[in-house]
Amino acid sequence: MSVVEVVTGMDANTRNARTVTVTMVVPPPLRSCCGGASQLSLSAPTVRGALEWIERSHPSLYRSVCDETGKVRRHVNLFVNTSHVRDRNGLDTALAQGDVITILPAVSGG
């Protein structure tokens, strides 16, 4: 299992917010977008902040998760721990120290 750890600088949107360290779990089909890492360790106050971080640090991963308007793609699900973000506060879901964000793309076939 490959894990990438980073220290994140805050941008204008997160400067006044309390940031915490969380883990983002990257599914196998998207690991090539982040150097093969299965997990990313990052600091962000919200799910939106975590997505902004991947936009800066792993743009191809971001483009796989979000569309050109910044919305999460329809076939991608984001969970914080065991709760889907849509069942919480969407992208504004606050993160707590040690939370795990899981990227889960839909699987289809026939």
List PLM regions with ranges.
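Ubiquitin-like/PB1-type beta-grasp interaction modules and other compact soluble beta-rich domains
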Residues: S2-G109
